[in-house]
């Protein structure tokens, strides 16, 4: 791990062996310009494991790469699980490295969500249980590759999700407004410009292409929401809950037009 307490839960590509550019399969689509089989390096991956077209990914048809977030799983696998080795210099470990990436990513995503919940003062009474869950999941993520591969991530998720939901409820209770529940809703292309959505729940909602310009989204819960192409320009996201960097990158924001 990178600190005495917790691993870094955001991607540090400089310490990773380009795992997300090799392990998963890509299907040619609006998100990827080419087909790529699992375990085959992307043609844009350089010898030093950096992307040759990183600054031009959207323009070159690789928007899927822009919105992907491993939550720090890549560097942990490279530096901790495999002790700084990489699949190019030690080909025999390639299969093992690639196999644990989806497992580690899911574990790190859970750790990230727990850390977000631990930042909520309104959920203080849940903090002991959240810390216990965090420590247990982090210990699982620190296991050897052979053990990691067989990890039942769903069993941990089922125990953590109720805590996260309750933390969200406590945080949103004081948001004011109607606090609409759009959990799991199909809101593709919905027009919600300027709407009062304080404390709303968008957990698992499909917000692809939704117009949320100038909306009041303070303390709204975005856990697992699909924000691809959602227009968030001018929206107030102060205190938004469980909104990941990858979700922000998938949406249209004010920074896209600077």
Model segments located where?
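Tandem repeat scaffolds
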Residues: 165, 173-258
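Hydrophobic scaffolds flanking metal-cofactor catalytic centers in soluble metalloenzymes
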Residues: 1-159, 163-174
């Amino acid at each position: 791990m990178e600190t005495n307490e917790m691993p870094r839960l955001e991607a540090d590509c400089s310490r990773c062996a380009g795992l997300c550019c090799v392990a998963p399969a890509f299907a040619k689509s609006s998100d990827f310009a080419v087909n790529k089989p699992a375990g085959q390096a992307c043609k844009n991956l350089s010898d030093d494991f950096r992307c040759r077209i990183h600054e031009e990914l959207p323009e070159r048809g690789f928007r899927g790469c822009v919105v992907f977030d491993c939550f720090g799983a890549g560097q942990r696998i490279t530096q901790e699980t495999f002790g700084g080795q990489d699949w190019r210099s030690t080909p025999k470990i390639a299969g093992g490295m690639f196999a644990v990436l989806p497992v580690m990513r899911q574990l790190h995503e859970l750790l990230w969500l727990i850390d977000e919940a631990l930042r909520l003062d309104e959920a203080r009474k849940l903090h002991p249980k959240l810390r216990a869950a965090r420590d247990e999941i982090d210990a699982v993520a620190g296991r050897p590759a052979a053990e990691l591969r067989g990890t039942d991530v769903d069993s941990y998720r089922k125990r953590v999700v109720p805590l996260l939901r309750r933390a969200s409820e406590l945080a949103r209770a004081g948001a004011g407004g109607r606090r609409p529940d759009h959990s799991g809703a199909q809101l593709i292309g919905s027009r919600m410009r300027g709407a009062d959505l304080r404390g709303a729940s968008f957990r698992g909602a499909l917000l692809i292409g939704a117009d949320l310009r100038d909306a009041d989204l303070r303390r709204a819960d975005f856990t697992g929401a699909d924000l691809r192409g959602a227009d968030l320009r001018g929206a107030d996201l102060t205190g938004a809950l469980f909104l990941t960097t990858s979700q922000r990158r998938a949406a249209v924001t004010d920074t896209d037009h600077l």
